[in-house]
Amino acid sequence: MADEIATLISSAGLTNETFLVLCVIAVIVIGAIVVIITSRPILDIYPYLTPSASVRARKGRLFDEKQLSEIVETNNVHEFENYLKGVPDYADVLEEYPVDKALDIQCADTYEFVARIAPKEIRSSFVVMSKKTDINNIKSLLTAKEVGLTEEETEDLLIPRGVLYEDLRSLIDADGVTDVVTSLDGTEYAAVLEDALPKYENSGMVLALESALDKYYLESLLRSSNVPADENKQILFSYVGTQVDIANLKLIIRAKKDNLSYDDIAPYILEDGYQLREWKLKDLMESPDVTNVISGLEGTKYSDVLTDAMAKYNENASIAVFEKALDAYLSKSAKSLSMKKPLGIGPIIGYVSQKETEIKNLKIIARAKREAGFPNSKIMEMLI
């Protein structure tokens, strides 16, 4: 056997030393390939290790069902606030701000925290989410100017967070809505607000400006995640896309409740939806009423959850039942997505969604506790 190998080496014109060198190189190359193949999963996981640990720690501090029930059982808004003051995550902000503003600050801090720690490949979507604070502050400022609030009342509406907070705070003495819009020149929101300004001037209502900001936010959010190159980004795209679909549905349902036409709604709908594509959205916008919007969703993943809410809608004619059903669906969908990549994006999506739900539920409880004698059983029904 050895003689045959030696003969083959000689016939190839190689010396024994050259052959040995080639063998060593081959072993190194094969070894490198094996290392790359086996280490790739580790390389994919590594960027998520620290962020996942951070959000898991915070997730452990979220209220469980027992704690939420205890909060519902508080007798009034004062007891409600005292309960939250015993929770480190809420204690500091509640010492300085009223409860509604404190909850908004907690939400803003959550977005900023996740945008800061998220791995680079998915960070852009969470950065966009963190901009909701600036957008909400702009909307509050526009509303304040529309209804003629004082400077003090206007400042109370602003959430002391976000990139533009100080700039917006300096505009509380602006002369009116148009002055606010022109003063935002140089920000990323300038163009979208200026484009919507003629509609405001024709109608005298800031709804056109607010809706333009909402659409810009959804466009930015969808654009930030629309290249699902790997499983983590695919999950992110599903999470973001579902948010866009639900925002479109809420807008269409509200519009049909107010008997608005296709032409009234279309400018504010994001046509590039996720599962609800342009043709389907067009059909829904052309529906004559809320009931036909719901029936028009047959065959989509939103059909069952909204159909189940129809009975309550028929009882009280309140579209709040649909909005709650959609919020609950988003929460359930996020929970399902969070389990698909436990060593990747999963914990991040799970935490953000659960924190959003917690804050929404706390706001529901706070509003109810301001009404004397509001039944606790009714509050539990209202929670997401």
From Swiss-Prot:
Annotated Gene Ontology cellular component terms: plasma membrane; proton-transporting V-type ATPase, V0 domain
Membrane topology, as annotated: Peripheral membrane protein
Domain of life: Archaea
Annotated keywords: ATP synthesis, Cell membrane, Hydrogen ion transport, Ion transport, Membrane, Transport
Subcellular location field: Cell membrane
GO biological process: proton motive force-driven plasma membrane ATP synthesis
Signal peptide extent: none
InterPro entries according to UniProt: ATPase_csu/dsu_sf (IPR036079), ATPase_V0-cplx_csu (IPR014272), ATPase_V0-cplx_csu/dsu (IPR002843), V-ATPase_V0D/AC39_subunit (IPR050873), V-type_ATPase_csu/dsu (IPR035067), V-type_ATPase_csu/dsu_dom_3 (IPR044911)
Membrane-spanning residues: none
UniProt keyword GTP-binding present: no
Pfam families: vATP-synt_AC39 (PF01992)
Keyword Transferase appears in the UniProt entry: no
SUPFAM superfamilies attached to this UniProt entry: V-type ATP synthase subunit C (SSF103486)
Stretches of the chain forming a coiled coil according to its record: none
Record-stated family: Belongs to the V-ATPase V0D/AC39 subunit family.
Subunit-structure text: Has multiple subunits with at least A(3), B(3), C, D, E, F, H, I and proteolipid K(x).
Function: Component of the A-type ATP synthase that produces ATP from ADP in the presence of a proton gradient across the membrane.
Protein name: A-type ATP synthase subunit C
